[in-house]
Amino acid sequence: MNHNTSFQQQLLQQLHQPGGSNPGGVGATGAGNNSPSYPEASLMGSKFWQKQMQLAQLSRQTGPTSHGYARAAAINSRQQHGRDGAQVDADKDQGPSQLTLVDLAVQTVQQDLVEQQQATAASTPQRGYTNQQKKDQLEEERQMTLMQQEKHQYWADLDMSGQGLMCLSPPLFRSYEFLLKLYINHNKLTTLPPAIRSLRQLRVLDVSSNMLTKLPPEIGMLHNLRYLFAFDNYLSTLPHQVGQLYQLEVIGLEGNPINQPIKEKLAQGGTKELVAELRESAPMPAAPKPREWIVLEEAGGRGGAATAAAATEGESGSTVATATAGANAAAAGASASSDTFTVMSYNTLCDKYTTVQMHGYTPLWALGWKHRSETLLKEVIGYDSDILCFQEVDGASFEDFWSPKLHQLGYAGLYHPKTRARTMSKEKDAKRVDGCAIFYKTKSFCLIEKLSLDFSSLALKNNDFKKTADTYNRVLNKDNIALIALLEHVTTGQKIIVTNTHLHWDPAFNDVKLIQVALLLDEVEKFAERVAKDSNRVSARNQDGNNVKYESGKKLPLVICGDFNSTTDSGVYSLFSQGTVTNHKDMSGRAYGKFTDEGMNHGFTLKSAYSNIGELAFTNYTPNFVDVIDYVWYSSNALSVRGLLGGIDPDYTSNMVGFPSVHYPSDHISLLAEFSFKKQKGGDGQPKKALDFGNSGSHSGSRKT
């Protein structure tokens, strides 16, 4: 028998059980609840509103029972396994199973999916769902979540239905953040506390048949919510924050005096269109406070960039002064001294990755490239950094947007796409592949040399890298890259190696990220040694001999920027900061020859610029991931950090599901650090005096690559 038919028969049978035939159900008798609404003729033909009526009727019929969901689960479990836990013979009639509101909602979503597939691919036969395929996807998600948690939580559903509850204590929500399903239907609740925002793992929320007059705005923070049942309350409208529930499949509103525009939108397009309408029509959120500029007094401060407002102690022991920064505070500080410069690292979020499926909490107009590019450019101009390291820049935006816009501002740029761009047969497709870009101010730096790196090629050529199954299955099939620029500081003659990279994203491949960094640092070391040996080299900008010599490559100023997709407890962070990694958990069970047998190391003295303040709260802000994965590494023996751009206003993020948002155009935030050169000996054993080239001919010695 077709499962859809049997499912409908079960529903009809259950609805006609005693107490189920009354169209008013519990809605008419439960304390304070509305009676069901009788839809206008204009709604009767809507399949979406018919499903609302069907779901609401089942809610009224099954809801009055105390702990109705828990009882249904127990009944269904006994039918499946028997009272003694033994598997029951499927051929024997065990009686009807207990259908819940969630079961019916999941079934309607699956039916809609099948209809959509049939409509878009009519020529492809579509098989009906088998019993195995119809397993509740919410339960599958629950099992996956439980397996991934370090502290195993063996239950994730809470049923408090039919208890006559008049209020809920906020600690309930803060203590049960792991909940996936919460049933508080058929009570006497008049409000939901704002603390409900804590339940960010929630997939199902049933608040039907209460006395709610409104839903709290904080409900918009429940970004994992799939099913929201609010039948038979006193809701006349919905907060616009419901528009942030981009994964919502079903919202139940029948039995509420809901306003006509919401009712019509739900009847015409269903839940998805209603959520989209609320998202797109939401008012502009309040602008965040400006990011603060943090002055590292240990390095001598930033001449007059800002007045210190407060002092705190960083993890490294250095005292930092915090001051509110204007849009161009970094540039103001850098210009105060001839031996300082600023570096920005920014994953700008490639346009092709901005999908509704990934970022459905953001209005479409704010997700579009026009708005994001304008906001990105405004931010870059405001901070006026001397060196820019961008990740996730596709070829088209580099050529058509970034290069011409930044050229007008006095920058020259370099670009290297990910390796898959070379496999594209069409130039248009190749230009959609993202990569890394480096821009530098030609009045501050001139380009000596550039080097492009492909990690898969480096692994293939490296003799210490054993060609194992892990090598072929995990490393060689990744297309991540790095870009290196050797720059010379115009006023001091100091050379600096600027490196920009974007490592593999998947947390299941932390070993690959560590290998990629080891390969990168090995290449940078070889590059630096070659530059040091050739330190008598004089650029077109320094014909009068303002040239600095370096005893070895490790003495060269070095900055490595990027999206490393690695947290501070990762092997990547350890290798950078400690100079060596052996037996790290990220490499557990992997075989990469000497890289795993003897560990990995480098000879630089590297430090994260933001480690001077204990790192930021986050650099990547998405619904299911908020952490630090972007860094600006520098050679602490050759450079000093003078200042850092602070984090995002926490009051702003407390109301944001994730980035990008109207005000922040990427899911990453920009990092900005001000450095000063430590003194290096010149050819005569003394530091050379900085040259003043003025404004004339400021572009003559640079070349754009």
Swiss-Prot record:
Residues 119-132, 695-705 have a biased composition (Polar residues). The keyword Repeat applies. It comes from the Eukaryota. It is found in: Cytoplasm; Nucleus. The gene is CCR4. Mg(2+) binds at residue 392. Its cofactor is Mg(2+). Residues 21-30 have a biased composition (Gly residues). PROSITE patterns: LRR (PS51450). LRR repeats lie at residues 152-175, 178-199, 201-222, 224-245, 247-267. Residues 81-94 have a biased composition (Basic and acidic residues). This is CCR4-Not complex 3'-5'-exoribonuclease subunit Ccr4. It holds the Pfam family Exo_endo_phos. InterPro entries: CCR4/nocturin_mRNA_transcr, Endo/exonu/phosph_ase_sf, Endo/exonuclease/phosphatase, Leu-rich_rpt, Leu-rich_rpt_typical-subtyp, LRR_dom_sf.
